[in-house]
Design a protein with these regions (language model features):
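Short amphipathic alpha-helical segment that frequently serves as the phosphate-/nucleotide-binding helix
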Residues: 25-26, 71
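Conserved strand-turn element in the central/C-terminal portion of the radical SAM core barrel
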Residues: 3-24, 43-49, 56-64
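Auxiliary Fe-S-binding modules of radical SAM enzymes
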Residues: 33-151
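Short amphipathic alpha-helices and their capping/turn segments at secondary-structure boundaries
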Residues: 1, 26-36
């Protein structure tokens, strides 16, 4: 920051697994708020074959998040992000969507998109909808910086 050199940060959603999902989101946001990146690129955790993480999952030490649960983590992360002039991008949403925008200006729109995606998969009480109750996602670009999702 002192040198005036902007930098990009890559974060990994899902890294805390089910047990630490909320803590991971809040602590990641806290770190990002302190370091003031110019761009945040969110990726989804990928478990590679033969890695120590795969072994931890096999032993039940880590329970990975599914793609819909990662949306809960991303929502909590965005709710706790308080950065200025920072571009946020997640190209891994539900393995097929991109949520992106400038912070803080685009924060509400990105949260709205995530809320709409969550509503397709979860009931208001947080329970998962049955597959035949889940909505379909269609795309419509509202601006050059990111898609909107319509139900």
């Amino acid at each position: 920051d002192e040198a005036g050199i902007g930098y990009y940060v890559t974060i990994i959603l899902g890294l805390g697994g089910k047990n630490y999902r909320n803590l991971h989101a809040i602590e990641t946001a806290r770190l990002l708020n302190r370091i003031h990146p110019r761009c945040i690129w969110a990726l989804k955790l990928k478990v590679w074959e033969g890695t120590p993480l795969e072994k931890m999952i096999e032993r039940g030490e880590v329970v990975p998040l599914d793609k819909e649960e990662i949306l809960f983590e991303e929502r909590l992360l965005l709710q706790n992000l308080h950065v200025e002039d920072c571009f946020f991008m997640d190209t891994t949403v539900l393995d097929r969507l991109t949520v992106q925008g400038w912070l803080p200006e685009g924060k509400d729109q990105m949260l709205s998109i995530i809320e709409r995606l969550l509503a397709l998969h979860f009931n208001p009480d947080g329970s998962r909808k049955k597959p035949d109750e889940q909505g379909q996602v269609s795309f419509k670009f509202l601006s050059p910086i990111g898609p909107s999702v319509n139900q």
